[in-house]
C-alpha cells in the first residue's frame, strides 16, 4: 500500500505556466491560429504534463498486461481461456496486431503477466508479476481479496517504473484476458451509475442470447458482491481483474512521472475509472486513443470527460487503438517543437494579429 500511496501523492496539477507558453508559441507558428485543430490542443496538453514547451515523444512504450478471469466459467466469451496465454506468446514472437502497429509507430511493446493460469516465467522478454493464477468467479463471490487488488495496482506501478531507465516519453495501455469485458462492464456500471445493459457489449462476438447471458452474469455479480462505488479498490476486488488493476497502476505511475498516458479501449477505460477513483487528478494526464465499438466505452469516456482521438470501430484491445493515438500525440508535440515561428521563417503575419 505504501507504493500506491506514494505514487498518488506525487501526482500534481498540470503545469499552467508551460501551457500558457505553449499556447503562445502555437499562436506564433507559421499557420493561421487554430488551423491544426486538436493537434494544437494536444501539444499544449503535453506541455502541461511534461512542463516543457518544446519536447519530443520519441520513446514510445505500450504496456500490454494479461490475466485470466474466473467469471469465464460462466461462458461469457466465445474463446477458451488458454487463448490468453497463447496470445502472450504471440506478443512475444511479434505476431499480434499490437506488434504490427507498434512497429509502424516506432513503439516498444512490454508484455506483463499479472494473473494468467499458465506459467509464463522465463519465456523470452515476458515479464511475470503474477499475483494469482486467474481471478475468482465474481458471479459467486469476490474476484480477489482487497490485498490482491492493491497488489495488482502496485504491480502496474512497478512495471512502468522499471522501464524508466530505458526512457519512456509517452505510454499507452493495452490488455489481454479472455472474458475481461465482463468485469469491465461491471466496473463501468458501478462507477458510472449506468444500467448493466447500457454498458455491456458483445465482446469477442456474442450473439443475442450470449449477450443476454453476459448481462445476467454481471447483474448477479453485482448483487452477490455489492461493490461500493465510493471505494475503487473495493470495486476492483469484488468485480475486477488483475490486469485491470495493473493498468490502473500504469496510469497512476505515468502521471506521477509526468508522462502522457494514452488509454486504449473498454478494458483500459475500466482501469482508467479505477485510477481516477483513486486519484482524481490523474484524469488530466490521460488521453483517449480511440472510441471502441464496445458500448460501455462511450459511456465511461463521457463520465471521464475524455474526447477520443480516433473512431475506427475497433474492439481488439491489446493497446492497438492507443498505439495509433500515441502517434498523433507525438506528432502534435513535434509540430509544437519543430515548426518555425513567423519571425523565424520571415513570414508576414495576418494583418489583424
From Swiss-Prot:
It is an enzyme of class 2 (transferase). Pathway: Nucleoside biosynthesis; alpha-ribazole biosynthesis; alpha-ribazole from 5,6-dimethylbenzimidazole: step 1/2. The active site is at residue 318. Its EC number is 2.4.2.21. It catalyses: 5,6-dimethylbenzimidazole + nicotinate beta-D-ribonucleotide = alpha-ribazole 5'-phosphate + nicotinate + H(+). Gene3D superfamilies: 1.10.1610.10, 3.40.50.10210. GO terms for biological process: cobalamin biosynthetic process. InterPro entries: Nict_dMeBzImd_PRibTrfase (IPR003200), Nict_dMeBzImd_PRibTrfase_bact (IPR017846), Nict_dMeBzImd_PRibTrfase_N (IPR023195), Nict_dMeBzImd_PRibTrfase_sf (IPR036087). Keywords: Cobalamin biosynthesis, Glycosyltransferase, Transferase. It holds the Pfam family DBI_PRT. GO terms for molecular function: nicotinate-nucleotide-dimethylbenzimidazole phosphoribosyltransferase activity. Belongs to the CobT family. NCBIfam families: cobT_DBIPRT, PRK00105.1. Catalyzes the synthesis of alpha-ribazole-5'-phosphate from nicotinate mononucleotide (NAMN) and 5,6-dimethylbenzimidazole (DMB). HAMAP family: CobT. This is Nicotinate-nucleotide--dimethylbenzimidazole phosphoribosyltransferase. It comes from Desulforudis audaxviator (strain MP104C). The lineage of its organism: Bacteria, Bacillati, Bacillota, Clostridia, Thermoanaerobacterales.
Amino acid at each position: 500500500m505504501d507504493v500506491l500511496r506514494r505514487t498518488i501523492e506525487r501526482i500534481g496539477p498540470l503545469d499552467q505556466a508551460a501551457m500558457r507558453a505553449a499556447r503562445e508559441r502555437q499562436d506564433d507558428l507559421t499557420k493561421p491560429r487554430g488551423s491544426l485543430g486538436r493537434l494544437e490542443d494536444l501539444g499544449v496538453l503535453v506541455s502541461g504534463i511534461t512542463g516543457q514547451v518544446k519536447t519530443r515523444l520519441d520513446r514510445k512504450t505500450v504496456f500490454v498486461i494479461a490475466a485470466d478471469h474466473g467469471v469465464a466459467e460462466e461462458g461469457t466469451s466465445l474463446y477458451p481461456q488458454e487463448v490468453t496465454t497463447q496470445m502472450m506468446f504471440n506478443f512475444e514472437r511479434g505476431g499480434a496486431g499490437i506488434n504490427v502497429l507498434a512497429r509502424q509507430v516506432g513503439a516498444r511493446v512490454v508484455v506483463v503477466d499479472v494473473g494468467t493460469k499458465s506459467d509464463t516465467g522465463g519465456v523470452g522478454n515476458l515479464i511475470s508479476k503474477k499475483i494469482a493464477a486467474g481471478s475468482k468467479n465474481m458471479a459467486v463471490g469476490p474476484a480477489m481479496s482487497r490485498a490482491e487488488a492493491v497488489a495488482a495496482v502496485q504491480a502496474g506501478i512497478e512495471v512502468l517504473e522499471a522501464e524508466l531507465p530505458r526512457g519512456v516519453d509517452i505510454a499507452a495501455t493495452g490488455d489481454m484476458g479472455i472474458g475481461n469485458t465482463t468485469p469491465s462492464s461491471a466496473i463501468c456500471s458501478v462507477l458510472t451509475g449506468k444500467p448493466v445493459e447500457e454498458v455491456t457489449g458483445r465482446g469477442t462476438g456474442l450473439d443475442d442470447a450470449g449477450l443476454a447471458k453476459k448481462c445476467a452474469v454481471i447483474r448477479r455479480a453485482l448483487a452477490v458482491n455489492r461493490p461500493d462505488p465510493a471505494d475503487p479498490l473495493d470495486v476492483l476486488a469484488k468485480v475486477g481483474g488483475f490486469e485491470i488493476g495493473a493498468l490502473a497502476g500504469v496510469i497512476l505511475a505515468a502521471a506521477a512521472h509526468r508522462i502522457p498516458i494514452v488509454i486504449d479501449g473498454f478494458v483500459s477505460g475500466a482501469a482508467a475509472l479505477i485510477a481516477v477513483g483513486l486519484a482524481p487528478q490523474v484524469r488530466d494526464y490521460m488521453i483517449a486513443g480511440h472510441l471502441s465499438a464496445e458500448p460501455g466505452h462511450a459511456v465511461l469516456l463521457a463520465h471521464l470527460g475524455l474526447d477520443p482521438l480516433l473512431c475506427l470501430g475497433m474492439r481488439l484491445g491489446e493497446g492497438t487503438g492507443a498505439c495509433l493515438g500515441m502517434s498523433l500525440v507525438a506528432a502534435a508535440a513535434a509540430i509544437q517543437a519543430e515548426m518555425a515561428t513567423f519571425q523565424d521563417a520571415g513570414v508576414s503575419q495576418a494583418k489583424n494579429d
